[in-house]
């Protein structure tokens, strides 16, 4: 290129952990942010079946935010443990496509519950992940998506043999 490409970045991160071992309660919280500025973009075009990639001088920026809260509570006498995580994500920025600068935005919210029960005769585990997301590209809003994944596992030991039964269910909106 006829110019010197450069990128600047500003990053922030905060984490807090809380432990109350006697009460079997644990939690953590994290927040991160990132902002990037660049004076160049990569323009990719396909000509005669070949990829042509060129640097173009153009100021662009992007922002990423991520927050997460997780907690866990155990019940030792009952051989039971619960936990749940909540994650929120936001991203926006610009990309260069076919000689045009196009803006984008993405948001998502994730809920991740978990249950574990472990009496002397078995181990039962449930894990879920439920994600709601929304995107827009070039000022056009795309369809919201609600995807989830759930798993259930049962394990039992009979004499010296572990028997395990697992089920996994996916739901993806395309």
How should these model regions be labeled?
Residues 1-174:
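Exposed, low-structure sequence patches enriched in small/polar residues
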């Amino acid at each position: 290129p006829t110019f010197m490409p450069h990128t600047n970045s500003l990053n922030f991160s905060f984490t807090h952990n809380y432990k109350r071992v006697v009460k079997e309660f644990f939690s953590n919280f994290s927040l991160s942010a990132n902002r990037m500025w660049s004076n160049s973009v990569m323009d990719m075009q396909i000509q005669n079946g070949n990829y042509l990639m060129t640097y173009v001088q153009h100021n662009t920026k992007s922002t990423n935010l991520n927050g997460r809260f997780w907690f866990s509570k155990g019940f030792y006498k009952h051989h039971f443990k619960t936990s749940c995580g909540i994650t929120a994500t936001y991203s926006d920025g610009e990309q260069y496509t076919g000689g045009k600068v196009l803006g984008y935005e993405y948001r998502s919210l994730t809920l991740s519950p978990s249950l574990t029960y472990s009496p002397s005769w078995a181990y039962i585990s449930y894990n879920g992940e439920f994600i709601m997301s929304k995107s827009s590209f070039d000022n056009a809003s795309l369809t919201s998506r609600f995807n989830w994944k759930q798993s259930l596992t049962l394990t039992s030991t009979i004499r010296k043999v572990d028997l395990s039964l697992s089920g996994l269910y996916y739901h993806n909106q395309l």
